[in-house]
Amino acid sequence: GVDVKFLTPDQVKEIWPLCNTSDLLGAIQHPEDGYIQPADLTQAMATGARNRGAEIYRNTAVVGIKQTKEGWIVETDKGAIECEHVISCSGNFARQTGKMVGLDIPVIPVEHQYIVTEAHPDILKRKKEGLPEMGVLRDSDSRWYMREEAGGLILGPYEDGAPACYVDGPSKDSEYELFQEDLDRLAPHIEGAIHRVPAFGEVGVKKVYNGAICYTPDGNPIVGPAWGLKNFWINEGHSFGIT
């Protein structure tokens, strides 16, 4: 049911002028696909929830979850909240949340790196001419994605065997924590990216980010009612985003 278009190499070049199409047979385009800044999406969803009567408690740690005959009691460092339903959507803390109610939620955070380059003259020229931003480009053979970012490019690899982190859950002080980058792990992806998009190799690297991202054993998120618990719902392990 996904709306896709099959493109010829010439059509790929028209949509992504910086792409080397000399060895391509074709491509698949998702016309309605896109990306959104996570902070903007979070604020929009929070605003929508508040408009519908929800209350959001920021900087409030959950220290325990207890089941009762009527529902649940969520214990926090600022008091207890009684409720009928609980939804676990705690990201890197999924395993810790599960342990509070006796669940082993199979979600493990692993290190994920991505590279941000300096601005490229061709991209700046496109912006100046008012041309649309090139969409997200994915190369399945070299296992990476790429898109524009502030006049430059972002390269994100799909690494094999990326190191696990926070196996027992992150500490309470781990918010926004980043790890040491490892460019050796990225070398095959960088090589493939330069072949497919030569412009990527023509500019300097502005920053390499290495942070935690959640994965499940099969790569799919876990969404739905928890096994063996009434009115406890799970929404964990989304890895690369919301579909």
Question: Where are the language model's segments positioned?
Answer:
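Active-site lid/adjacent beta-loop-alpha segment flanking the redox-cofactor pocket in flavoenzymes
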Residues: 103-104, 120-232, 236-238
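Helix-loop-beta segment of a Rossmann-like dinucleotide-binding subdomain
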Residues: 6, 16-52, 170-177, 230-233
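A short alpha-helix-loop-beta-strand transition element characteristic
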Residues: 1-11, 21, 104-107, 202
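Helical element adjacent to the flavin cofactor pocket in flavoenzyme catalytic cores
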Residues: 28-85, 89, 93-96
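Central helical "cap/lid" subdomain
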Residues: 80-133
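A short, glycine/Asx- and small/polar-enriched loop/turn
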Residues: 18-24, 66-73, 215-219, 228-229
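Short loop/edge segments at beta-strand edges and connector loops
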Residues: 8, 58-60, 207
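Dinucleotide-binding Rossmann-like beta1-alpha1 core, especially the glycine-rich loop
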Residues: 1-15, 141-146, 151-152
